[in-house]
């Protein structure tokens, strides 16, 4: 569990919080194998036996004061007595992980779900209202997925278009049963329930014995023809192009189908839904005409109109999926408007991921799904953050849903080691921290389940397909941290973690954009940076009448703040906040919202302000980081650059590079080694591109050199982009200072 705070020295009072203008909160990556310093938790048993405070329900930790008969809660100060069992346990403190470490991960006895067959279940739902190219990509992706699945897993193959296809691959020849989707939305469901068409255990096949048959079934998949879709919907062939992708009906039926096995056959089923376009048939169909209309409309802001969901169907369906133990990952492969603003809820609210690929030609989908299945994940998670009594959690951010009864309790359906969540803080009362010498305490409890293989061998030592067993383990992970209140504003500034500040800022601006539009979101970000600059100058300036030209917007006396203007400028230039008029596809904006709101702070900072590294040769690094400007490239005089944008890795050879340097760089050089390591350390597969300046089109690489670009997107300037942005911040900061002097 990694926990990073925006400031390591907390503001001592509400006045100090307002005066510093810094975001106050934490970013939490609960299922990370190590903490933010690289240290693993202390593990053990007894997660169900840790004493809890009678007043605030916090867990006993190594930060608590222990006495012979009891302990004092580190969060609220309540004195709690030990029961007989705890008293006996704590007579041997060395055997109690919670007394020796502030970061523990303990198994909960008897909470593993006795009687539940904890079989890993995976289902592929494939769109057949598609092109041949799309289908070939999906076949490649599913073959990669089969290699990543552990033996003993169950796998089901379903297709959808104007009908649902269920595949039974457990016999010698793949058998498919079709159920037609009614085109009339007023009809009540399918004519035949999926369970009646094919029993669930015939649909779910053991991967270890049926892998070849599953692969054979994939080879039989063909796109449905326009004639076939027209005949099913009762239209003539030339009218069929309007319909044929019954995604909503198919997902609703699949969730109901799988729900019969929840708690008996499986504890969690993961569905991979592959889409080639917007649902346009049956329940949950989406009207994609609103995208075209926004271009031509007058008086309607496309920067606002295309961000909210069109219908609540998929959000409601996600709630049903959660109750059925189903997690859905959506893989959309299309450059057409698909309305991900509506579809995203089915994935992120059921614990899944949303992926978007513009085309099938150079898609990283096979690598992404293999990577997704190869990393460990937890499910059925409950995340709870508690604080000491002087402050409390305010807003919470991330792909979870709040508990309907308890505050600051979030439920996470499926969580991997990259998934990150955020909280901001507020004071409980106007006095702030009542005793500035005492540390503020944050405790994060994360209860989760994992499936662990427990192989059984036959008498002769061989492993039969039926002998793969899995056990369901319930665990409790607790992290307790202390933060000292700052004595003054300068201490707060000196303790800032700019990546975490950006992390919470991005969460806030995403919500603002969905609610009020991209323009308002951009305004909010610019206004915050201007306020931060004004507050910084007010704190450090001895003369309140500081002239405008003397306002320090580079935070020259505080290294921890110096990267923030660049990060904010890059955020405003990112597709997340670029205006619709610049050609940002609304689905791509939604994809970035979903991706960015799940990233940990360092990855998010890289996605917002990419890392540019120079090399003097493929085997020698020249400089670890440059600003994103053409001037930086010219001044460096290095011939080779590696640009890491998180989603892309671009190797750029300048036109002046030595012709003897091999292009692309050889696989055994330092540059390639660096690339391979970067690809391994992230949740998605970055797309690798090689560009030779002077010979290849350099537009992609140059588009990331943002510091010469106008922040409002009016076009490239002669180099005044970031400079002009700084001046605009200086002007607004000066106005804030003058207004407060006048008042």
What are these regions (language model features)?
Residues 1-743:
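Extended acidic, low-complexity intrinsically disordered regions
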């Amino acid at each position: 569990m990694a926990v990073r705070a925006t400031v390591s020295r907390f503001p001592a009072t509400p006045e100090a919080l307002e005066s510093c203008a810094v975001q106050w909160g934490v970013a939490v990556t609960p299922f990370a194998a190590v903490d933010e310093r690289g240290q693993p938790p202390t593990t053990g048993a007894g997660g169900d036996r840790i004493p809890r405070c009678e007043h605030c329900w916090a867990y006993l930790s190594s930060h608590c004061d222990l006495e012979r008969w009891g302990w004092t809660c580190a969060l609220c100060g309540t004195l709690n007595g030990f029961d007989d069992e705890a008293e006996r346990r704590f007579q041997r403190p060395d055997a109690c992980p919670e007394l020796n470490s502030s970061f523990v991960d303990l198994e909960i006895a008897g909470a593993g779900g006795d009687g539940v067959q904890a079989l890993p279940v995976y289902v592929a739902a494939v769109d057949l209202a598609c092109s041949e190219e799309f289908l070939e990509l999906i076949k490649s992706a599913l073959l990669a997925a089969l290699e990543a699945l552990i033996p003993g897993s169950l796998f089901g193959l379903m297709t959808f278009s104007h009908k649902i296809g269920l595949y039974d691959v457990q016999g010698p020849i793949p058998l498919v049963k079709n159920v037609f989707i009614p085109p009339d939305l007023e009809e009540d469901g399918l004519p035949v329930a999926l369970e009646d068409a094919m029993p669930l255990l015939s649909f779910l096949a053991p991967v270890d014995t049926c892998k070849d048959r599953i692969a054979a079934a994939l080879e039989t998949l063909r796109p449905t023809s326009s004639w076939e879709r027209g005949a099913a919907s009762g239209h003539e062939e030339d009218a069929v192009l309007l319909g044929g992708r019954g995604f909503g009906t198919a997902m609703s039926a699949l969730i109901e189908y799988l729900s019969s096995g929840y708690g008996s056959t499986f504890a969690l089923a993961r569905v991979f839904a592959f889409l080639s376009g917007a649902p346009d048939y049956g329940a949950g169909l989406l009207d994609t005409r609103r995208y075209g209309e926004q271009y031509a409309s007058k008086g309607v802001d496309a920067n606002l109109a295309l961000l909210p969901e069109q219908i609540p169907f998929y959000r409601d369906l996600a709630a049903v999926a959660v109750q059925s133990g189903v997690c859905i990952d959506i893989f959309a492969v299309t450059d057409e408007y698909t309305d991900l603003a509506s579809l995203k809820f089915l994935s992120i609210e059921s614990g899944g991921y949303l992926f978007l690929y513009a085309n099938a030609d150079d898609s990283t989908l096979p690598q992404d799904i293999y990577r997704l299945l190869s990393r460990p994940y937890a499910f059925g998670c409950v995340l709870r953050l508690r604080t000491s009594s002087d402050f409390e959690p305010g807003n919470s951010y991330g792909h979870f849903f709040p508990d309907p009864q308890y505050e600051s309790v979030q439920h996470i359906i499926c969580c991997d080691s990259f998934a990150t969540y955020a909280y901001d803080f507020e004071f409980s009362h106007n006095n702030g921290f009542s005793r500035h010498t005492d540390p503020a305490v944050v405790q994060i409890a994360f209860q989760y389940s994992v499936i662990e293989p427990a192989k059984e061998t036959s008498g002769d030592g061989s492993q039969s397909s039926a002998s793969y067993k899995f056990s369901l383990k319930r665990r409790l992970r607790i992290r307790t941290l202390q933060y000292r209140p700052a004595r003054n504003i300068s201490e707060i500034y000196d303790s800032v973690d700019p990546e975490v500040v950006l992390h919470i800022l991005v969460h806030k601006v995403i919500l603002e954009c969905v609610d009020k539009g991209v323009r308002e979101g951009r305004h909010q970000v610019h206004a915050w940076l201007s306020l931060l600059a004004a507050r910084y100058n007010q704190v450090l300036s001895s003369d309140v009448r500081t002239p405008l030209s003397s306002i320090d917007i580079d935070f020259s006396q505080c290294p921890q703040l110096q990267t923030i203007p660049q990060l904010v400028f890059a955020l405003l230039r990112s597709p997340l906040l670029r205006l619709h008029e610049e050609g940002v596809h609304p689905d791509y904006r939604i994809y970035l919202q979903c991706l960015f709101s799940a990233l940990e702070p360092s990855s998010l900072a890289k996605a917002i302000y990419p890392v540019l590294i120079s090399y003097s040769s493929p085997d020698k690094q020249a400089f670890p980081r440059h600003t994103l400007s053409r001037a930086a490239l010219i001044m460096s005089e290095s011939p080779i650059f590696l640009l890491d944008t998180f989603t892309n890795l671009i190797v750029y050879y300048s036109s002046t590079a030595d012709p003897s340097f091999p292009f692309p760089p050889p696989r055994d050089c330092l540059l390639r080694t660096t690339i391979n390591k970067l690809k391994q350390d992230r949740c998605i597969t970055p797309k690798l591109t090689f560009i030779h300046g002077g010979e290849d089109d350099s537009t992609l690489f140059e588009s990331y050199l943002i510091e010469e670009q106008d922040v409002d997107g009016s076009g490239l300037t002669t180099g005044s982009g970031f400079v002009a942005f700084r001046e605009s911040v200086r002007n607004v900061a000066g106005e804030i200072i003058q207004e407060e002097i006048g008042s």
